[in-house]
A protein has these predicted regions:
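Carbohydrate-associated surface elements
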Residues: 156, 175
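Nucleotide-activated donor-binding/catalytic signature segment of Leloir-type glycosyltransferases, i.e.
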Residues: 246-263
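Membrane-proximal helix-turn-helix segments that form the acceptor-binding/catalytic region
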Residues: 132-149
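Aromatic "clamp/platform" in nucleotide-sugar-dependent glycosyltransferases that forms part
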Residues: 283
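Glycosyltransferase donor-sugar binding loop
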Residues: 42, 176, 206, 233-246, ...
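Short His-centered aromatic/hydrophobic patch
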Residues: 91-96, 115
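Short alpha-helical donor nucleotide-sugar binding micro-motif in glycosyltransferases
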Residues: 270-275
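Conserved donor-binding/catalytic core segment of Leloir-type glycosyltransferases
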Residues: 197-213, 219-222, 235
């Protein structure tokens, strides 16, 4: 079978992208012909083809381009033409849905929407971000008008999709790469690298530094923890996708908070192994892949009892 998988980016730091890469490799192992189409990519794929369509380099321009991607009809048309002859197109996130939408409309290629969800707009910090997320959700809904079937990554997302679009979907939980994320990994070298002493406890958060991840609340909670347990450090690993929000987080932090914008994907399991507890204050997660990965590494997880967390957090 010839399968196309669409994702806006293919980077190691993105949970959705790791899901896409694992999915592509699994299909390829079953001897399907797999091509991943992305606007931007860093990793070099093994076992499947990659077609990078391109987008602006500036973070601000990227956000605008992705929101208004439907205006770049030439790129959508050219990408959809490449999908002729494919048996199925799986679109993982807006704005790639527009390519699948057009391929379905023009060439009758089967269109499967993989629902990772979109964070609630009210969780964002200013009026421009709220408006952006409202428009993002609106355009996403339009791009789903002709889907053949949908997959949701949790029961929470299944309910949200039904409520927002009336689309029925099948629940398929994200898979963890159990060869990489497992118990028994030695995180000693990472602790030494970070300067964590034997008598100190290390808390870990992994994820994009976005307002809906509620990292500012995590920092406030950590301050309270630090008052009672002064030998505690908090490591935050994530790309600052909202520069002003990142500045706010840095200003809220003291010497006991360590920020790392980038961690080599091969090293990520060792960071989970190095921590004593995985923590998140996120108020919206379609699945929360880092929490699942931390649990696979044998770590307890502390999270709010909201969104998909009751389904995902089993060792908290």
């Amino acid at each position: 079978m010839k399968i196309a998988i669409l994702t806006p980016t293919l980077h190691y730091f993105s949970g959705i992208d790791r899901v896409v890469e694992l999915q592509a490799k699994e299909y390829a192992k079953k001897h399907h012909q797999v091509t991943v189409f992305a606007l931007e990519s860093t990793p070099r794929p093994k076992g499947f083809k990659l077609d990078v369509l391109g987008m602006p380099k500036s973070l601000l321009l990227q956000r605008l381009y992705r929101l208004l991607f439907f205006l770049d009809f030439k790129k959508i048309k050219n990408a959809a033409e490449k999908l002729q002859g494919y048996d199925v197109v799986i679109s993982h996130f807006y704005p790639m849905n527009w390519i699948a939408y057009y391929a379905k409309k023009k060439y009758n290629v089967k269109y499967v929407y993989y629902n990772h969800g979109i964070g609630y707009n009210y969780l964002f910090s200013n009026i421009f971000e709220v408006l952006y997320m409202k428009l993002f959700a609106f355009f996403n809904k339009l791009s789903l008008k002709n889907v053949d079937s949908a997959v949701s990554i949790s029961k929470f997302m299944q309910k949200e999709l039904k409520k927002e679009t009336r689309l029925e979907s099948k629940v398929v939980y994200n898979k963890i790469d159990k060869k990489r994320f497992k118990k028994g990994i030695d995180g000693t070298k990472i602790r030494k690298k970070l300067g964590i002493k034997n008598n100190e406890k290390l808390l870990l958060f992994v994820g994009r530094l976005s307002p809906h991840k509620n990292v500012h609340t995590l920092l406030r909670i950590f301050d309270l923890v630090n008052e009672k347990l002064p030998n505690t450090k908090l490591l935050i690993i994530g790309k600052p996708t909202f520069p002003n929000y990142y500045k706010k987080l840095k200003n809220m932090s003291d010497k006991n908070v360590i920020f790392k914008e980038f961690v080599n994907d091969k090293e990520l399991p060792y960071y989970y192994a190095a921590c004593d507890l995985y923590v998140t204050a996120s108020l919206w997660e379609g699945f929360n892949l880092p929490a699942a990965e931390a649990q696979a590494c044998g770590k307890r997880v502390v999270a709010f009892d909201v969104c998909s967390h009751p389904e995902i957090v089993k060792n908290g």
